[in-house]
Amino acid sequence: MKNLFTDVLIVGAGPTGLFLSNILASFNIKNVLIEKNKSTVKEPRAVSIDDESLRVIQSLGVINKFLNKISINYGSYYISPNGKNFAVIEPTSKTYGFHKRNSFDQPDLEDLLLKNLITKYKSNVFFNTEFLNFS
């Protein structure tokens, strides 16, 4: 592999790494994203996304591609082991222009962010690449 010089090295192509790489690239900050796995993970670990995260997706210019893949404005009922409700979450406001609770498929979000990173920003993303040390 040739030597690469960058301002920021991001280790991990999960949602956080992909968001960070996109945001830095949107401000013309050179970054390289590495991931030890062969691709993004195809099984969801996160299932809910809030309004402020949707604003970040909006700032990256891909909100319209993402909104049709989510279920908006859902609530939750929390039930104790003995079957009694102990909490109800039913958000109703759209303080930042989006509903506060939305369900999504994490692999869809990761695919969208990765495609945006590669096509819009022409960023360097390396899979099957492990971070070994820093000195």
Q: What kind of region is each of these model predictions?
A:
Residues 43-118, 126:
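Active-site-adjacent segment of FAD-dependent monooxygenases/related oxidoreductases
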Residues 2-16:
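Beta1/beta-strand and adjacent pyrophosphate-binding region of the FAD-binding site
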